[in-house]
Amino acid sequence: MLQTAKFSLRALKHSIPHLGNCMQKQSYRNVAGPYYSRVRLKKYHLTKCLQNKPRIAGLARNIPSRSFSCKDLLPIKPESEKPISENMDAFEKVRTRLETQPQEEYEVVNAEIKHGGFVYYQEGCCLVRSKDEEADSDNYEVLFNLEELKLDQPFIDCIRVAPDEKYVAAKIRTEDSETSTLVVVKLSDQPVMEASFPNVSSFEWVKDEEDEDVLFYTFQRNLRCHDVYRATFGDNKRNERFYTEKDPSYFVFLYLTKDSRFLTLNIMNKTTSEVWLIDGLSPWDPPVLIQKRIHGMLYYVEHRDDELYILTNVGEPTEFKLMRTAADAPAIMNWDLFFTMKRNTKVVDLDMFKDHCVLFLKHSNLLYVNVIGLADDSVRSLKLPPWACGFIMDTNSDPKNCPFQLCSPIRPPKYYTYKFAEGKLFEETGHEDPITKTSRVLRIEAKSKDGKLVPMTVFHKTDSEDLQRKPLLVHVYGAYGMDLKMNFRPEKRVLVDDGWILAYCHVRGGGELGLQWHADGRLTKKLNGLADLVACIKTLHSQGFSQPSLTTLSAFSAGGVLVGALCNSKPELLRAVTLEAPFLDVLNTMLDTTLPLTLEELEEWGNPSSDEKHKNYIKRYCPCQNIKPQHYPSVHITAYENDERVPLKGIVNYTEKLKEAVAEHTKGAGEGYQPPNIILDIQPGGNHVIEDSHKKITTQMKFLYEELGLDSTDAFEALKKYLKF
């Protein structure tokens, strides 16, 4: 996915809690005129992080009942068991190399911005620029040394160049924190830092009537963005508050339309939005309200040729539709319906060109691109290859072409370009990935308890025999209207090559089938997502994909709610579970209004403090509230000490309760009963949006292989090749 957000619908994801690694990292984009964005892989060392110590006493310790923490990476085995199998040697070799060698991210971390004849990017620990034709050489100009901020392993998250190239602004953060510092550098023969602002989320440049650069930015406090500031530099330096949102359940986000004509001030929560237009040519004029907030109404705005294009769910059906109106008549009564989506359609992104509007869609779990001719309102719908599971958006200022990439969990991104003049989609030529012949992707459905058909995406080797005897790794999320993360991951490729079946369950609460799909899995319909997950796993087994003793389940963040609920209600369906930064204590979290995100989360989980119905409903599925003495699958939890979004206290509380339940059940289970491993791995440092480290990947893979009693030698040797040792 991306590397840049083309539309505020996508850019919004930076501010929604619990997203983190549910999606690929994105950079905000500025493509006015000659802008475009590229990315580089970011190199870093893991050794510093490994030397850190947890700052919360008592958390990094062995938890009885055969478990370990970050200090003990191997589970405790009773003396009666066999020694650790020889296949662990491969894992240990990989882990040793990981701890001593520089690593490359597979996720995008740093954005590049082209403005005029220069490309701005990060090189080493510096913000630099080089001439466009020399962008891939070592001939660059250093603009700012990030080490001046005295941060631990800082990197540039986003870059914006002022319209006349007098200034460049860069948002800088570290792997261990979501807090960002915005640095403004004055461009000259001797570049100097003009100003710095702490705790910045989104930011954009505009130019006023006197050609003065004006910077707008949002200030983040305790993960909440409620304040917008406006700043100028040079002789007329000033920094003033422009807007403050009073409702704590909303947040603010800035988005510059693609043509830079308007800066949009977006005020929103999970279900409702309000947009104000700031004139990109007269930023000192009062902003213009498009439509005041109405509960349940979402809308996002683009601009082209004095017309506003509005993506909104207003009207029936309550799915997204595209409307337009004159820029000088933005009120809702002037909106005209322009394009309607089909049922079961998710709008992934929108991009506006001179003569075309391009919609990136997911319909019935398959990817499409719709190209709308703005001169004649013609629509060309292109069904994309069935192997594709996700888009990676490329910002582009060329009005003649629309480039993008397609990817899947087991296939690296591949470039495609739609050329408007030819009216055709062109595929990148070159070496064909062998995975296309050695694996299969299937789209199947499971019938949930209420009859609703739930889509699944399944991957397995083409030549696999007797799939019922193959290991299965199931993935689920089901919250916030977000899709399952299905970008390319080398470890997923390795698993399929090693005979595993991968299944992605697109349950209600997620967004794969549109807004209603999300609505049917939130608040007092959360149990629909659990019923969907149960139906998916049972359907996989009934159709010959693996069996319970070889079935594992993986989830991140809010996906932990459904996984934890499944472990409590249907533990017999699983053998092992891996959870990362999981949300497990829903009730106590939502009761604690002192937590920074509780008020923003009310639209997703409900308000147990004031609504007894919500409270009782949460009690029915909350993982932490429903633990009981019974057999559980083995559980590996990765938590981060500095996670600001999912409190570590809730994860530890869940682990302790689960440990006690397992111990009580084991006492009465009889001789020979094999209790599960309950593993809590607390990573020093880190935060909710921490990047995927190779150490974490190999640790989790080792856990799955060990729990299923499989030989991991070939898998880890293959993984070493992908990690480029």
Curated annotation (Swiss-Prot):
<feature type="active site" description="Charge relay system">
    <location>
        <position position="643"/>
    </location>
</feature>
<dbReference type="InterPro" id="IPR001375">
    <property type="entry name" value="Peptidase_S9_cat"/>
</dbReference>
<dbReference type="GO" id="GO:0005856">
    <property type="term" value="C:cytoskeleton"/>
</dbReference>
<comment type="similarity">
    <text>Belongs to the peptidase S9A family.</text>
</comment>
<feature type="active site" description="Charge relay system">
    <location>
        <position position="557"/>
    </location>
</feature>
<feature type="active site" description="Charge relay system">
    <location>
        <position position="688"/>
    </location>
</feature>
<protein>
    <recommendedName>
        <fullName>Prolyl endopeptidase-like</fullName>
        <ecNumber>3.4.21.-</ecNumber>
    </recommendedName>
</protein>
<dbReference type="Pfam" id="PF00326">
    <property type="entry name" value="Peptidase_S9"/>
</dbReference>
<keyword id="KW-0963">Cytoplasm</keyword>
<comment type="function">
    <text>Serine peptidase whose precise substrate specificity remains unclear. Does not cleave peptides after a arginine or lysine residue. Regulates trans-Golgi network morphology and sorting by regulating the membrane binding of the AP-1 complex. May play a role in the regulation of synaptic vesicle exocytosis.</text>
</comment>
<keyword id="KW-0597">Phosphoprotein</keyword>
<keyword id="KW-0645">Protease</keyword>
<dbReference type="GO" id="GO:0004252">
    <property type="term" value="F:serine-type endopeptidase activity"/>
</dbReference>
<dbReference type="InterPro" id="IPR029058">
    <property type="entry name" value="AB_hydrolase_fold"/>
</dbReference>
<dbReference type="GO" id="GO:0005829">
    <property type="term" value="C:cytosol"/>
</dbReference>
<dbReference type="InterPro" id="IPR023302">
    <property type="entry name" value="Pept_S9A_N"/>
</dbReference>
<keyword id="KW-0539">Nucleus</keyword>
<keyword id="KW-0206">Cytoskeleton</keyword>
<dbReference type="GO" id="GO:0008233">
    <property type="term" value="F:peptidase activity"/>
</dbReference>
<dbReference type="Pfam" id="PF02897">
    <property type="entry name" value="Peptidase_S9_N"/>
</dbReference>
<dbReference type="GO" id="GO:0042147">
    <property type="term" value="P:retrograde transport, endosome to Golgi"/>
</dbReference>
<keyword id="KW-0720">Serine protease</keyword>
<dbReference type="InterPro" id="IPR051543">
    <property type="entry name" value="Serine_Peptidase_S9A"/>
</dbReference>
<dbReference type="GO" id="GO:0005634">
    <property type="term" value="C:nucleus"/>
</dbReference>
<comment type="subunit">
    <text>Homodimer. Interacts with the AP-1 complex.</text>
</comment>
<dbReference type="GO" id="GO:2000300">
    <property type="term" value="P:regulation of synaptic vesicle exocytosis"/>
</dbReference>
<keyword id="KW-0333">Golgi apparatus</keyword>
<dbReference type="GO" id="GO:0043001">
    <property type="term" value="P:Golgi to plasma membrane protein transport"/>
</dbReference>
<dbReference type="GO" id="GO:0006508">
    <property type="term" value="P:proteolysis"/>
</dbReference>
<keyword id="KW-0378">Hydrolase</keyword>
<dbReference type="GO" id="GO:0005794">
    <property type="term" value="C:Golgi apparatus"/>
</dbReference>
<feature type="modified residue" description="Phosphoserine">
    <location>
        <position position="137"/>
    </location>
</feature>
<dbReference type="InterPro" id="IPR002470">
    <property type="entry name" value="Peptidase_S9A"/>
</dbReference>
